[in-house]
């Protein structure tokens, strides 16, 4: 059989490792904004706005309400124009079953009566990011408050 002394084995291993690293640099996966889907960009952009303040009627990082937040995020991250109100946003897109939610979907709630009054962006693991009265926050959809008020979800980008 073919046998190398320990010094030559170490040198050979170092050369093979260097060649593999070199090739992985040239031929490895490409991680650019272009490679991200619109829904991934939407989620990433929404996370940058966490802790922005709440402002009734707000549509900018200086202050958002729920639908102003989703409208702003989708416009900036996915070049998608959404209607201004939560109720009107609920009329857009394709309905999605709760068990089929994907990051970037819009989730809708009735928080003050009989019509849709709150919208947020689903980010995965039963969580969403939305502009609540305490500002832009991550929330758990499994909390009783949200479970009782859930209306449905829409997919507006892929």
Regions found by a protein language model. Give the residues of each.
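...with weaker cross-activation on analogous glycine-rich loops/strands in unrelated enzymes
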Residues: 2, 80-137
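Bacterial N-terminal signal peptides that target proteins for export
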Residues: 3-16
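Bacterial N-terminal signal peptides
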Residues: 14-25
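Sec-dependent signal peptide cleavage junction
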Residues: 23-41
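Catalytic cysteine-centered active-site loop
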Residues: 32, 53-103
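Extracytoplasmic/secreted envelope proteins and their assembly/folding machinery
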Residues: 39-43, 47, 67-71, 101, ...
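Sec-exported extracytoplasmic/periplasmic mature domains
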Residues: 47-55, 74-79, 109-112, 155-158
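Short, low-complexity, Pro/Ser/Thr/Gly-rich segments in the mature regions of secreted, periplasmic
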Residues: 145-158
């Amino acid at each position: 059989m073919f046998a190398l002394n320990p010094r030559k084995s170490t040198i050979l291993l170092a050369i093979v490792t260097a060649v593999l690293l070199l090739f992985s640099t040239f031929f490895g996966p490409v991680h650019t904004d272009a490679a991200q889907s619109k829904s991934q960009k939407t989620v990433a952009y929404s996370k940058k706005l966490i802790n922005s303040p709440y402002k009734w009627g707000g549509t900018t990082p200086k202050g958002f309400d729920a639908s102003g937040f989703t409208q702003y995020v989708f416009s900036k991250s996915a070049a998608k124009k959404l209607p201004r109100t939560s109720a009107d946003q609920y009329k857009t897109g394709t309905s999605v079953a709760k068990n089929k939610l994907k990051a970037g979907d819009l989730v809708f709630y009735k928080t003050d009566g009989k019509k849709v009054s709150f919208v947020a962006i689903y980010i995965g693991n039963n969580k969403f990011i939305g502009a609540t009265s305490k500002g832009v926050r991550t929330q758990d959809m499994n909390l009783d408050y949200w479970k009782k008020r859930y209306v449905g979800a829409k997919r507006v980008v892929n």
